[in-house]
Amino acid sequence: MATYDKNLFAKLENRTGYSQTNETEILNPYVNFNHYKNSQILADVLVAESIQMRGVECYYVPREYVSPDLIFGEDLKNKFTKAWKFAAYLNSFEGYEGAKSFFSNFGMQVQDEVTLSINPNLFKHQVNGKEPKEGDLIYFPMDNSLFEINWVEPYDPFYQLGQNAIRKITAGKFIYSGEEINPVLQKNEGINIPEFSELELNAVRNLNGIHDINIDQYAEVDQINSEAKEYVEPYVVVNNRGKSFESSPFDNDFMD
């Protein structure tokens, strides 16, 4: 250890001071910066208060797993049957993040992303007592958008006062793929929920059971079939399941 003049440091009446702390302690035992409970509680409450003052209302729709496949990491029977209203701070008020909307080889793609900040204790109080997980859904009624949580960042900011009072959620537009999605609004005791909040979830319930991304089911397919009638000849599907036929559907010109 580097040598120094101990007389440079102030000493208490019992002749102790920082000189002794420097020689015998890992951290200063008289200063509790990272583990002072009162400061941690104050910071946590201030974050929660700020979110409730400047935040937005969202709906949390957790994914329920019925029969998860541990090999492929998926559950073909997963469903969404419950929803809670909660407060979140919208980090990106300038607009959505991500690749946004663009045309690709597969048509128009919408890859909007949003970043939300929540206070974990406030979130657990308003929701189901648990923190959000990847794969759960967030409905943003202000823009009538449904997002799927991609990542929950627990370390930004990193341990202020020795505790994390913020969770940052990164979510992308949800792509419906046949799941049962019929959320019912849950009303925790003691939390004021407006009477008609349940109606806001109708937009989410309308996804349940659809097979096409268009409002009119199979509208694009029907249009293609209609335009193709002039050029496409009738055909028979050969898979041993269709109607029986006496001759081969392939004519001689095709076989040559």
Curated annotation (Swiss-Prot):
One Pfam family of this chain: T4_neck-protein
Keywords (A to Z) from UniProt: Virion
InterPro entries: Phage_T4_Gp14_neck-protein
Subcellular location: Virion
Predominant subcellular localization, coarse grouping: virion
GO cellular component: virion component
Protein role: Plays a role in the association of the virion head and tail after packaging of viral DNA within the head. Together with gp14, forms a neck at the portal vertex of the head to be ready for the tail attachment.
Subunit field text: Gp13 and gp14 form a hetero-oligomer complex with a stoichiometry of 10:5.
Protein name, as recorded: Neck protein gp14
Source organism of this protein record: Enterobacteria phage T4 (Bacteriophage T4)
Gene it is expressed from: 14
